[in-house]
A protein has these predicted regions:
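Solvent-exposed alpha-helical segments and adjacent loops
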Residues: 1-605
Length: 605
């Protein structure tokens, strides 16, 4: 995290242990790297829950940038720990000149971390979900019943949503480290947390109610017991969202800026939080600030950016409030988006030395947010996944052995979704069949090319090539002896459909592709583009993934030995246009001659 300006601020909040904190063993370790041109007497303050915990000189940080700050005992009932980093940076006695250099910088390193030791180990079910793990394992028994298989799919999807930054493995046997075990449906209690020498264990009965309870109750106070028997739980709430999302609902609570120069507030949101790609979108801004005295020559300017594109500017000199609604062009929207509010405070030359009143500005989270009306129809591009996966869904398995591949894929989508995806699981018939979406709003198919017949971008029934239509160069040729994993996205009867399959004789490549998407360390799921993904085994532990745009504006698919009039028309399109233009010119000339020719004078008799 790069902090810029004379007096920036960084706040990081984490949940406190439920049973209290051991102050003798708990600390936060920070790597603070100042700009080399800063005045040695510049300082960095560290506060914990708004109480001063340490002051560090830039001179000392240059010698040792890593500092360890003890976390004191928390007051009763305190649920969160907030660490604030507040630098006070300068280069000279002229703050205006310092700001103009752009060198008032402090970097908070990526290797900074919290070490939180609970006073008493938290053995509640909620305690398992509150911890941060380097890796989780879902242990699933072999030979599952259809009901247990669906429960395993749901549980993996839910864990991926609750632990979006944690790799989650699928295994059929216990392993060391933190793990979640799917128990038989008659296991009691339905939810149980155990702490063993090998690590934390969460045992979950293979019941619909148990998995729904994990999601619906963990964020409340319902899972504060070591073992829980679930009597009943409501279905996952699917209430229609009002077409407004406040900044508080985005997890941003009344952000505050205080300092000089150029400062920014960044609000991150994704299409899933909006429920899809809106037809129109606007940002409602409610900002309060201390007035900047324009009579003295001070200036305050505000800017609004969406994904790096400047949309609006405001002259805020002398104002104490900004209450505006800014239209956000939907053409600029991506899967993940950034709305940035930037404020430039320029002091007059006469006010640059000595005591200078900083700008203090705050955004009201409840009255600020995003507004939209209606949604665009799906367009068949992976950029809109998983935002368009709304309502009830279905996962169709060609074989029960493909369940891990399906779980990895659904889990990858749940990591990016506003709510976990809990689709119905069905096993497809062995014979080839045409699939219909039925009453489902979307579906995921995991099956071989000889088992389903779908109007997908690539027909897998025969050899195919992906070609560049501009130069006819072959970008990918699927030879009979090769093995590929494929993920294709298209619309079936207007409904989003994902088909995970393979080319060749190795179905394991489909699982390798979905496992790569599910691993948050690869960030593959965040970068989905086009409408087709291909994967091949570049090495035993390396899967090479490539995305393709096979829409009419992108690459083309050619099937050797099969005539394609579309490719023929595209290949000779310029000659066809030239011939058509010549024919039109000849026709126009003939018409002109007939209409413009002079009539012959009659011969007198």
């Amino acid at each position: 995290m790069l902090l810029q300006g004379a007096n920036p601020r960084l706040d990081v909040t984490v949940p406190a242990p439920l049973n209290g904190l051991d102050p003798e063993a708990s600390f936060v370790q920070l790597r603070l790297e100042p700009s080399p041109v800063l005045k040695p007497t510049s300082t960095v303050r560290v506060l914990i829950n708004d109480e001063l915990a340490g002051i560090f000189l830039v001179r000392d940080l240059r010698q040792e940038p890593v500092v360890r700050v003890p976390i004191p005992a928390l007051p009763p009932g305190e649920r969160f720990i907030t660490v604030s980093v507040q630098p006070f940076l300068s280069i000279s006695d002229d703050i205006c000149a310092d700001l103009n250099t752009g060198n008032l910088l402090l970097t908070v390193g990526r290797d900074s971390f919290f070490e939180l030791v609970p006073r008493v180990p938290d053995t509640t079910v909620a305690g398992f979900l509150r911890l941060v793990y380097p890796q989780l394992t879902l242990v699933v028994p072999a030979n599952l019943t259809p009901e247990a298989a669906e429960a395993a799919l749901w549980l993996y999807s839910l864990l991926s949503h609750l632990f979006p930054q944690t790799p989650i493995l699928w295994s059929n046997r216990p392993v060391a480290g933190a793990q979640v075990t799917l128990e038989p449906a008659n296991f009691t209690p339905h939810l149980q947390h155990e702490i063993t020498p090998e690590g934390s264990r969460l045992r979950v009965a293979a019941r619909r109610e148990s998995i729904l309870a994990l999601y619906e109750e963990w964020k409340r106070a319902g899972l504060v017991s070591r073992g829980i028997q679930v009597a009943a739980v409501a279905d996952l709430e699917r209430a229609l969202r009002a077409n407004r999302l406040s900044f508080r609902e985005l997890g941003i609570v009344d952000p505050l800026l205080r300092g000089f120069g150029s400062q920014s507030l960044v609000f991150n949101f994704n299409l899933s939080q909006l429920g899809g790609r809106p037809r129109d979108l606007a940002a409602q801004l409610d900002v309060i600030m201390n007035p900047v005295d324009g009579r003295a020559g001070d200036r305050l300017t505000g800017y609004v950016f969406l994904n790096g594109v400047l949309l609006r500017t405001y002259n805020l000199t002398g104002r104490t409030q900004l209450n505006e609604t800014v239209t956000l062009p939907t053409r600029l929207l991506r899967r993940f988006n950034q709305l940035e509010l930037r404020f430039d405070y320029g002091a007059s030359l006469g006010n640059c030395q000595g005591s200078l009143t900083p700008l203090t500005l705050q955004v009201r989270s409840d009255s600020s947010g995003l507004l939209w009306s209606g949604y665009q129809a799906p367009n068949g591009e992976l950029q809109e996944i998983p935002a368009v996966l709304q309502g009830s869904g279905r996962v169709g398995l060609g074989d029960p052995q493909l369940l891990p591949a399906a779980a990895y894929l659904v889990g990858a989508l749940s990591r990016l979704a506003a709510r976990p995806l809990l689709p119905t699981l069905e096993v497809l018939p062995k014979e080839e069949a045409n699939l219909e979406t039925g009453n489902f709003a979307w579906q995921v198919i995991v099956a071989g090319p000889d088992q389903v017949e779908l109007n997908s971008p690539i027909r897998l029934g025969s050899q195919f090539e992906i070609i560049n239509p501009l130069n006819q160069q072959v970008a990918l040729a699927a030879q009979p002896q090769e093995n590929l994993g494929l993920l294709q996205y298209f619309l079936l009867q207007g409904k989003p459909t994902l088909w995970l399959s393979w080319w060749g004789s190795d179905p394991a490549l489909a699982e390798r592709l979905s496992r790569g998407l599910a691993d948050p360390r690869t960030r593959l799921a965040n970068q989905l583009q086009g409408n087709v993904l291909t994967a091949y085994a570049a090495a035993p532990n390396l899967t090479q993934v490539q995305s393709w745009d096979l829409t009419p504006q992108g690459y083309r698919v050619r099937y050797p030995g099969r005539f394609s009039w579309q490719l023929l028309l595209w290949q000779y399109r310029y000659w066809l246009v030239l011939v058509l233009a010549l024919l039109l010119a000849v026709g126009a000339w003939n018409v002109y001659q007939r209409l413009a020719g002079r009539p012959e004078s009659p011969i007198p008799s």
